[in-house]
Regions:
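Alpha/beta-hydrolase fold nucleophile elbow
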Residues: 199-210
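Short beta-strand/loop motif that positions the catalytic acidic residue
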Residues: 420-422
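A catalytic-pocket lid/entrance helix-loop region that shapes and gates access to the active site
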Residues: 218-220, 225-338, 459
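Glycine-rich nucleophile elbow surrounding the catalytic serine of serine-hydrolase chemistry
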Residues: 208-218
Length: 532
């Protein structure tokens, strides 16, 4: 599929790590350098597109140098190439609430362009324009450093922090956030690329996680001819229900929590540090070696089979067991929210090594009992799941949800490729919810084998929300999707590394396959594993 115009519309042995690096080197190299002077960049200040309420607010040359600071979890401090940065606003207006709205965007046009365009997805409720780098799921080298033209935007509103929902008061701002803004920005970005380089982008890609993952799915569903390759990480599907799920975990864990002077549960007190270690050690004892080697990673979380009831104290509570109250709380938390009649309203969660994570800079592990980032600071002690589920259906997020649409015949028919990835220990959006969508997608599109000819899902053991945790959380899905689109090489595995396990690499395998140690070779090397 060649998306230029912007109109809607078995067992495999892992390649050696060095081969994977060679692929990246080939994909990262510029195809045809385009040398442009400062005047060509400045000239974009007068760019107009008929029928678009567009203002170019700046067009400046940026010399090669270090990257600017980016959002947590996607930091990149390496060098960036010389490029032209274009800043603009689409559809500036005053909303019904008296607030000024407009779709602000930033487009980086590298001097040595490789002919590719990448749309950088957002996060949270957006509301700011992040530096257009394309670092998400790109391993050690972001898209801009590879020669991609990269765009980012605020989806039509400015927010005070990542979860400022005040823009929902304005209908157009809401619709722009949910899906319209990214479609509009794609059209403008492609037009600017065409004007600057005097030729259109040869291939177009979209990469995002969380809200950006939902946005990637939106592109496959509502703009199926805009992009050739999409990478959707931990997609923020059914956001109201995922928040309900986080609250249900907090409520479940509050039953075992200590109380403050007012009788309220103290967040994070249901489990001691020794309890958390006991849980993770027990999960590893039950599930770690199922992949052929005990290495501190659970590569078959779906088939793990851990039961916390095995840790129930026979007598007094001590460091080698959990109280019946704690066990019950964990079981209810991991099962996911249900109504009194037993109806499951959001997916449950998988037993994994990151569910008790306490590392700073990331969301607390699922069982730490913390409140949702968008909920009350003090977790509730009770919950009316039925009422909350009904209330979710009245929120604007439902309009932009991506959990039910599985007819991607146009996207797939044009040769589009769609990669999903999700941290198994994600406390906010259950990995099982993404697995559920992917399996429904396969069912609606001719079965798993047929669907895997254009879409694949990779689960990341130990990883939290988009990054972090006791995980190998650095991997290059950007090269994987480019290689699939442009060379028809499907990603039978993706090599992952991470600071939590220095000197270790492992293959991430397309669901439902999992990584297994072959029993020979270096156990720290991904090349010693196969997906089966």
């Amino acid at each position: 599929m060649n998306a230029r115009n912007g109109r809607p519309a078995g067992i495999n042995k892992l390649r050696a790590h060095t081969a994977a690096l060679a692929v990246c080197a080939a994909l990262c190299a510029p195809r045809a350098a385009v040398a442009l002077d400062a005047a060509a960049c400045t000239a974009l200040q007068s760019f107009e597109r008929p029928g678009s309420a567009l203002e170019i607010t700046a067009a400046t040359t940026v010399p090669a140098g270090p990257a600017p600071a980016g959002p947590p979890g996607r930091a990149y401090s390496g060098p960036l190439p010389a490029h032209c940065r274009v800043d603009g606003i689409l559809e500036r207006r005053t909303g019904v609430d008296g607030v000024e709205y407009g779709i602000r965007f930033a487009l980086a046009l590298p001097d040595d362009w490789n002919g590719r365009f990448l749309f950088q997805g957002g996060g949270g409720l957006n509301g700011s324009v992040n530096p257009p780098l394309g670092a998400q799921a790109a391993g050690d080298t972001p898209a801009l450093a590879r020669g991609f033209a990269v765009v980012s935007n605020d989806t039509g509103h400015r927010g005070a922090g990542g979860f400022d929902a005040s823009f929902f008061a304005d209908q157009e701002a809401t619709l722009n956030f949910l899906w319209l803004a990214n479609g509009k920005v794609t059209v403008i970005a492609k037009a600017l690329i065409d004007a600057y380089y005097r030729k259109p982008a040869e291939r177009s890609y979209f990469v995002g996680c969380s809200t950006g993952g939902r946005e990637a799915m939106i592109m496959s569903q509502r703009y199926p001819t805009y992009f050739d390759g999409l990478v959707a990480g931990a997609p923020a599907m059914r956001t109201g229900f995922s928040n309900l799920g986080m609250r249900s975990v907090s409520v479940a864990m509050s039953a075992a929590a200590e109380r403050d002077a007012s009788g309220n549960p103290i967040p994070g007190s249901a489990l001691s540090d020794s309890d958390r270690k006991l849980i993770v050690d027990s999960i590893l004892k039950t599930c770690d070696a199922k992949d052929g080697i005990a290495d501190g990673l659970v590569f078959d979380p779906v088939g793990c089979g851990f039961d916390p009831a095995t840790l129930t104290c026979a007598g007094q509570k001590n460091a080698t067991c959990l109280s019946p109250t704690q066990v019950g709380a964990i079981q209810r938390a991991m099962a996911g929210p249900k109504t009194p009649s037993g109806r499951q309203v959001y997916a449950g969660y998988l037993y994994d090594t990151g569910i008790t994570n306490t590392a700073p800079g990331t969301l607390p592990g699922l069982l730490n009992g913390a409140a949702s980032p968008v909920g009350p600071r003090t977790p509730p002690a009770t919950q009316d799941v039925e009422a909350e589920a009904a209330a979710v259906l009245q929120t604007p997020n439902v309009l932009g949800d991506t959990a039910t649409w599985t007819n991607l015949s146009t996207f797939a028919g044009h040769g589009g490729k769609l990669l999903f990835y999700h941290g198994v220990s994600d406390p906010w959006f259950s990995a099982l919810d993404t697995v559920g969508y992917y399996e429904r997608l396969a069912e609606a599109n001719g079965g798993m084998t047929a669907t895997q000819s254009w879409s694949r899902l990779f689960l990341v053991p130990g990883m939290g929300h988009c990054a972090g945790g006791p995980a190998l959380d650095r991997f290059d899905l950007l090269s994987a999707v480019v290689d699939w689109v442009e060379r028809d090489r499907a990603p039978d595995s993706v090599v992952a590394t991470g600071t939590a396990f220095p000197g270790v690499s492992r293959p991430l395998c397309p669901h439902p396959r999992t990584a297994h140690f072959e029993g020979r070779g270096n156990p720290k090397d991904a090349a010693s594993f196969e997906c089966r």
